[in-house]
């Protein structure tokens, strides 16, 4: 999604963009790319294949966003003189580029050694967000919405690969507090597991499949529960009251950093929720009953992520092109 967000900004400025990837293996991602009229070329893997493809396409610049490529690919393309930008997470994973973008919280505090001549854009000022997020960003922090049963929206990526949905619904049910929840379940097995959760009086859960209307569902909700990760920045930009679940144990540090900002609530680590939902219920219960606290969290997130990250990144890329072409 972050590459798609930057692509949208580049297209907005008049650039022609092509994705080189195996998007057909993830249908919802393929739909997102092609639905914007962006061309797709099949993925290639070796340095020689990349140089041949980039020459055939007549590229002016390349943007990398990959954990799988051999470091030799990055080095060979940069050595060819083609201006390059790489989106990275912490360690560069072998990525060599003229511009390195690390949009992770706290990354601006790190001082890694850079490739010769490279610059680094780090922190939430460079978060890359899609049009559908920016179009729905409120002009002001959301005001408290009191009265009525709170509306909850829960989603965990395109596939919910770790099966978080049923356990989050168990935690919500364990609060005993009335709510109306919309939960995304990408498969029948997950949907059945969610439907099997015993609910208390006044609690209602609707299960749907993957949707392209995530942002609209977010802004229509009083509480959004999602996996801690890059989608968190979308929630904060939209002024959502965000409850985060750490779905992978080795991501606890990033999860804790985000919660420590005061702009989101930590629902818990998924392995803990699976063992016992009571701790998560103790977090969610008060939040469901306190519109003022939900509004405070929403305002903090709205201020933390201003939605202009892709503009700043594109500015640097076009400045690079102006110097090198």
Regions found by a protein language model. Give the residues of each.
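A short, well-ordered alpha-helix in the C-terminal region of glycosyltransferases
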Residues: 293-307
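Short alpha-helical segment that forms part of, or immediately flanks, the ligand-binding pocket
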Residues: 215, 232-238, 256
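Acidic donor-binding loop of glycosyltransferase active sites
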Residues: 219-230, 240
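C-terminal alpha-helical cap of glycosyltransferases
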Residues: 306-325
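Donor-nucleotide binding loops and adjacent catalytic segments primarily
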Residues: 138-222
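Active-site and donor-binding regions of nucleotide-sugar-utilizing enzymes
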Residues: 2-11, 20-116, 120
């Amino acid at each position: 999604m972050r590459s798609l967000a930057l692509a949208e900004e580049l297209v907005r400025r008049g650039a022609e963009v092509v994705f080189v990837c195996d998007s057909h293996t993830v249908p919802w991602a393929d739909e997102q790319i092609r639905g914007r009229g962006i061309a797709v070329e099949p993925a290639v893997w070796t340095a020689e294949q990349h140089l041949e493809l980039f020459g055939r396409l007549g590229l002016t610049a390349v943007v990398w966003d990959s954990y799988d490529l051999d470091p030799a690919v990055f080095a060979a393309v940069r050595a060819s003189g083609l201006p390059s930008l790489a989106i990275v997470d912490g360690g560069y994973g072998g990525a060599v580029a003229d511009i390195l973008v690390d949009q992770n919280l706290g990354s601006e505090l790190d001082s890694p050694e850079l490739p010769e001549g490279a610059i680094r854009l780090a922190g939430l000022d460079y978060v890359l967000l899609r049009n559908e997020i920016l179009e729905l960003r409120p002009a002001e922090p959301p005001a408290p919405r009191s009265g009525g049963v709170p509306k909850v929206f829960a989603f965990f990526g395109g596939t919910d690969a770790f099966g978080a949905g049923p356990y989050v619904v168990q935690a919500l049910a364990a609060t005993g507090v009335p709510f109306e929840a919309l939960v995304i379940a990408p498969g029948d097995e997950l949907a059945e597991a969610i439907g099997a959760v015993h609910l208390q009086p006044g609690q209602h859960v609707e299960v749907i499949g993957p949707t392209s209307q995530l942002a609209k569902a977010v802004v229509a909700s009083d509480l959004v529960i999602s996996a801690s990760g890059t989608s968190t920045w979308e929630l904060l930009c939209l002024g959502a009251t965000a409850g985060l679940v750490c779905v992978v144990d080795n991501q606890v540090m990033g999860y804790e950093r985000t919660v420590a900002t005061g702009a989101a609530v930590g629902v818990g680590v998924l392995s803990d929720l699976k063992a016992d939902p009571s701790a998560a219920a103790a977090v969610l219960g008060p939040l469901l009953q306190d519109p003022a606290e939900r509004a405070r969290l929403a305002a903090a997130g709205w201020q933390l992520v201003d939605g202009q990250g892709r503009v700043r990144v594109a500015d640097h890329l076009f400045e690079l092109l102006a110097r090198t072409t």
